[in-house]
Structures are given as C-alpha cells and as structure tokens.
UniProtKB/Swiss-Prot annotation:
This protein's name: Zinc finger protein ZFPM1
UniProt subcellular location: Nucleus
Family of this protein: Belongs to the FOG (Friend of GATA) family.
GO biological process: heart development; heart looping; hemopoiesis; regulation of transcription by RNA polymerase II
Residues involved in Zn(2+) 2 binding: 170, 173, 186, 191
An annotated GO cellular component: nucleus
Binding site for Zn(2+) 1: 37, 40, 53, 58
Main location: nucleus
Free-text comment on this protein's domains from its UniProt entry: The CCHC FOG-type zinc fingers probably directly bind to GATA-type zinc fingers. The Tyr residue adjacent to the last Cys of the CCHC FOG-type zinc finger is probably essential for the interaction with GATA-type zinc fingers.
Native species: Danio rerio
C-alpha cells in the first residue's frame, strides 16, 4: 500500500487522490482532512503523518513483512527437496560404505595371517640362536681354542708354580711368607706381577742404595 502511495505522490497526484485510494468513495473518513488507520485504530489530523505512519509504523506493514517471510520460508522449503535429492547421490556412497562394512572383517584374516608370522618368527628365534651358538662354537674351534689356550697358558704355568705347597717366596716382590696360604693370597690379590708383570721390584741384593750428599747453606755475615 505504501509503495503505491509513494508512486502516486511521485507522479504528482495530490493527497486527495491518495486518500481516495485508501478509502472507498462515500466513506466518512474521506470527508475529513486527516486520516484514520483502521489496523492501528489511530486518527491523524495531518495526512502526511498518516502517510509516515503507514510507511514506517503501521502494524499492517509488519504483517506484510511476516507474510513475506512466510512466503520466503515456503520457497526455501520448496527448494529444499531438490537439494536433498541432489545430496542423495552423496548419501548413496555412504550407504554403499555402510553396506561394504561387512568387508571390514577383512583385516581380521590379515591379522590372523600376521599372527602365524609372529609365531613363525618365534619359532625361528631358537634356530637363529642355534645358528649363532654353532657359529660361536665353530669360531671357538681350532683358532679360538688356540687363542684361549695361548692366553691362559702363562696363568696356567704361574698357577702350577703357585700350587707348590713348599713355595713361600715371591720373587717379583722379594717377600718371603711364613705360610703357603699367605703366599697364595698375596699372589692372587697383591702381587706386583698381577697388575703389571713387567713392573717387578728389584732384588735387595742387586739394588744399591746411593746416599745423596748433604748440602749446607752458607750464611752471610752481617759485618764484613
């Protein structure tokens, strides 16, 4: 209604023509200079105020806006089903994925297949250990055994000498013990040949003690 009034005002029609457009001819409201809004039950003395009310504040305008909103919502709902139909192809892959869900147990056979592999690895571990043991035993055969025998031969000879129950003298340290047991303990833990065989103490008879000359300090005389 307000748009029609504005269009007529722009075309140059007077307020009387606008008033006649709002009210049918012969109505009592058309006689008065003012105007009455029947939707809001308000009477205006100035027709311009009535136009402003109709344009901005009338409840019929809000009702028209609500009806327009309802129409827009109806259009949106009418347009919504095609969207749902358009989205249905996207939903179909989901349904296909859901239908393909029974194929999810496929990893289970893979898992079961992996379990025998783990068992096989566990079975192979003793074989690997046996192989390593056999290789180590082969390494310890002729060459390794000779190396070990060669490394233990000096200690074996020393132990053979230490096993003599009459031996109580340590040549490396030049110490004689009263008991053979003390000699054995000395050779096992404290002997210098055990730490460094080359570092043997010199015999007392061969080593000669050379005393150093004593140096005397000369005092300066205070009175010269």
């Amino acid at each position: 209604m307000s748009e029609m009034v504005h269009s007529r005002l722009k075309q140059g029609q007077g307020p009387a023509a606008a008033q006649q457009s709002f009210y049918p001819p012969g109505s009592p409201a058309s006689v008065h200079k003012g105007a009455t809004c029947f939707e809001c039950d308000i009477t205006f003395n100035n027709i311009n105020n009535f136009y402003v009310h109709k344009r901005l504040y009338c409840s019929s305008r809000h009702q028209q806006g609500e009806t327009g909103g309802l129409v827009k919502e109806g259009a949106v709902t009418a347009a919504a089903p095609p969207v749902s139909h358009a989205a249905s192809p996207q939903a179909r892959p989901v349904s296909r994925a859901a239908s393909a869900s029974p194929s999810c147990p496929d990893p289970a056979p893979g898992g079961t297949a992996s379990e025998p592999k783990v068992v096989e690895v566990k079975i192979e571990d003793p074989g690997l250990k046996d192989a390593t043991c056999s290789s180590s035993s082969e390494g310890e055969g002729p060459g390794g055994g000779q190396a070990s025998e060669g490394s233990q031969s000096p200690s074996g000879s020393a132990e053979d000498q230490d096993d003599d129950p009459t031996r109580t003298f340590c040549q490396a340290c030049n110490i004689r013990f009263s008991r053979h047991d003390n000699y054995i303990v000395h050779k096992r833990f404290y002997c210098a040949s055990r730490h460094d065989p080359t570092n043997q103490r010199p015999h007392s008879g061969k080593a000669a003690f050379l005393p150093q000359p004593i140096r005397t300090r000369k005092r300066k005389k205070m009175y010269e």
